[in-house]
Amino acid sequence: MKKHSNNLDLFDQTEECLESNLRSCKIIVGDAREAVQGLDSEIFDCVVTSPPYWGLRDYGNGGQIGAEDNINDYIKDLVDLFRDVRRTLKDDGTLWLNIGDSYTSGGRTWRDKDDKNKGRAMSYRPPTPEGLKPKDLIGVPWRLAFALQNDGWYLRTDIIWNKPNCQPESVRDRPTRSHEYIFLLSKGKKYYYDWESIKEPASDPKMDKKNRRTVWNINTEPYPGSHFAVFPRAMARLCVLAGSRPGGKVLDPFFGSGTTGVVCQELDRECVGIELNEEYASLAKERILRRR
């Protein structure tokens, strides 16, 4: 990968353009909060992404989004980032945002460190946010959704990602959580949405297909070589199909292992992915080249 200094003079970015027989995918290694500022305005059809969840995973970089001391700073960091992202969207562009929830720590602030697990849990657990009690469900997805709405985004719908193969939890005082949220937000009142491309089978045999509902049953999807469950291709495919035209351009500011890029290659879209962790960026490159 080729290193170069960017015009912000704030950090080093690695940019790599992977050409295929169909479309290109550019991977930028750096902090999304800075990298997005170097992107042109109104160039993307849609954004498909899953930010790091607050206080859950350590991706090995100081100052990373998700490692804030309190939930309000986490929400603010994401609102500020997605305000810059909105500038890069076409006027009819959309944001497809996957975000999970978490619970307050119950007063415990430290976990045992796990250096062998690259996607390890945070060794530091943020204290219980003001106004909440130990063991409370924080409501992170809706806090973020309403904050984005207040910042100018159109909040169009919530989608429940139901995970049939969810990980078990060692809890006996509540149900095991088996879902996350996907929010569809738009830059403007009118936006591109190809509903026909993601129609689902109808239960009525007289009907061919019907408008897709807001509960998506999609298994989590591990990938060999990673230490975490990657963004499922089936879910990314629905977002890319509905949110972009054939030959269009998609942004993922939290590229991770590159699922959005893999799907864009399959669907004849260009993609720009931003990833803070160089190891994950290398994994993303490998996946895109192998189309896996």
Curated annotation (Swiss-Prot):
It catalyses: a 2'-deoxycytidine in DNA + S-adenosyl-L-methionine = an N(4)-methyl-2'-deoxycytidine in DNA + S-adenosyl-L-homocysteine + H(+). One of its GO terms (molecular function) is N-methyltransferase activity. Keywords: DNA-binding, Methyltransferase, Restriction system, S-adenosyl-L-methionine, Transferase. Pfam families: N6_N4_Mtase. The keyword Cell membrane does not apply. The keyword Transferase applies. One of its GO terms (biological process) is DNA restriction-modification system. Gene3D superfamilies: Vaccinia Virus protein VP39. It comes from the Bacteria. Its EC number is 2.1.1.113. Residues 110-130 are annotated as: Disordered. Belongs to the N(4)/N(6)-methyltransferase family. N(4) subfamily. This is Type II methyltransferase M.SmaI.
